[in-house]
């Protein structure tokens, strides 16, 4: 089985490599036409996609998966329209390919340009959320990259319809269908072989839980762009407007609990905790609060936290609460437990905000805003392929620009080097 799976992945890679050479020089107009046609196909086949998604959702319900997991998987008419609209939005964005990043005129007459080019072939491994396949396919297409999608086994039926719609867009624009492919099997050996397919795959991007990302990090021979878990913090400083803080925290936790930008840990300055915490518990009635002894003393509705709570991405209606003595203690707690995704401060004190923004070394750091804004669409990228929490190549929401590399074009008039 393993040899057959390796051959299957290599065949997908070979086809993707051939398609990537065509995409690398495809005009912006053709790429945009493919995206618009793909969005139309998603709308046209909405009923097919809903039925496929129903089968997927029924499967995870029978398996006893939690509600937050089911929410990430589930599609409805509004979410399908959102997927189609996101694909269309990418068509309206500037094409990053061919953009001149720098120009150098040398004393010997050589003119050198640094120009943005596609990465080549991208492997995208993700869990649960079928819309990730459409976002990744659209972003890779617009940036001139071929992509091999490996969705979670729980979303196999939904992913299959989405990929068929994306391929329909490619056909309409006379671009190679192999530019967007999926690994159409739940066999886990497929992931291992994709991670080791150095001959054909230039970059692998995992998007999912800590287990998936750790597996990719440990087994990959192909370069990776890691999207770690979102243990996001919101710190309420002594100088916060508490009405503003309540609204921000409720949105940051409960708007959608199952996304990586949801706040998982609340850090409160002790000077405002007795006022703020009971207000939050009264308002956020569906949320479970787990706190340190100081938080439990303020409001007995808070359940005692243990050490693991400070490092847990709940992806559910649960929030850890830490009471701290001042800005330095707040920064130290966030720095010790953040996953490097997104962290926020709520305060009207400009100096405190400046200090927090400088000292917290996360991909996204916010002031007086919900952490759920940590999203490529909200950043004007149209969509995102993930949130990179590392520091190399790309950081934060990964959009079109981050899916390109560059090469140097050197223009001469017969110069020879002495």
Swiss-Prot record:
- Source organism, top-level taxon: Bacteria
Q: What is its main location?
A: cytoplasm
A Gene Ontology molecular function term of the record: NADP binding
Cell compartment(s), UniProt: Cytoplasm
Q: Which reaction does it catalyse?
A: L-glutamate 5-semialdehyde + phosphate + NADP(+) = L-glutamyl 5-phosphate + NADPH + H(+)
Q: Mind naming one GO cellular-component term on file for this protein?
A: cytoplasm
Sorted UniProt keywords: Amino-acid biosynthesis, Cytoplasm, NADP, Oxidoreductase, Proline biosynthesis
Could you tell me which pathway this protein works in? Amino-acid biosynthesis; L-proline biosynthesis; L-glutamate 5-semialdehyde from L-glutamate: step 2/2
Supply the NCBIfam families for this chain.
PRK00197.1 (NF001221), proA (TIGR00407)
Q: Report the protein name in the record.
A: Gamma-glutamyl phosphate reductase
């Amino acid at each position: 089985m393993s040899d057959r799976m390796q051959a299957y992945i290599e065949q997908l890679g070979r086809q993707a490599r051939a398609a990537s050479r065509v995409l690398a020089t495809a005009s912006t107009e053709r790429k945009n036409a493919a995206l618009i046609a793909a969005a139309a196909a998603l709308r046209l086949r909405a009923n097919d996609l809903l039925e496929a998604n129903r089968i997927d959702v029924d499967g995870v319900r029978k398996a006893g998966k939690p509600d937050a997991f089911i929410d990430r998987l589930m599609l409805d008419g509004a979410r399908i329209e959102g997927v189609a609209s996101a694909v269309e939005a990418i068509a309206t964005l500037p094409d990053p390919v061919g953009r001149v990043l720098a120009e150098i005129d040398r004393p010997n007459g050589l003119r050198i340009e640094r120009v943005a080019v596609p990465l080549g072939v991208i492997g995208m491994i993700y869990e649960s959320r079928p819309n990730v396949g459409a976002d990744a396919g659209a972003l890779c297409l617009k940036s001139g990259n071929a992509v091999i999608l490996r969705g979670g086994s729980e979303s196999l039926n939904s992913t299959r319809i989405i990929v068929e719609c994306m391929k329909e867009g490619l056909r309409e624009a006379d671009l190679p269908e192999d530019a967007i492919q999926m690994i159409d099997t739940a066999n886990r050996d497929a992931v291992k072989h994709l991670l080791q397919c150095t001959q054909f795959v230039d970059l692998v991007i995992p998007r999912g839980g800590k287990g998936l990302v750790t597996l990719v990090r440990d087994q990959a021979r192909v370069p990776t762009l890691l999207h770690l878990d979102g243990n996001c913090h919101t710190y309420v400083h002594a100088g916060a407007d508490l009405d503003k803080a309540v609204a921000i925290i409720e949105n940051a936790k409960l708007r959608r609990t199952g996304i990586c930008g949801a706040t998982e840990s609340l850090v409160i300055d002790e000077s405002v905790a007795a006022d703020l915490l009971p207000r939050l518990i009264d308002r956020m009635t569906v949320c479970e609060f787990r706190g340190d002894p100081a938080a439990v003393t303020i409001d007995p509705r808070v359940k005692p936290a243990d050490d693991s709570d400070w490092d847990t991405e709940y992806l559910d209606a649960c929030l850890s609460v830490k009471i701290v003595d001042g800005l330095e203690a707040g920064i130290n707690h966030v720095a010790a437990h953040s996953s490097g995704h997104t962290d926020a401060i709520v305060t009207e004190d400009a100096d405190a905000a400046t200090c927090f923004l400088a000292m917290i070394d996360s991909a996204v750091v916010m002031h007086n805003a919900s952490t759920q804004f940590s999203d490529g669409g909200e950043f004007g990228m149209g969509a995102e392929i993930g949130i990179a929490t590392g520091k190399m190549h790309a950081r934060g929401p990964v959009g079109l620009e981050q899916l390109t590399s560059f090469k140097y074009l050197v223009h001469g008039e017969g110069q020879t080097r002495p």
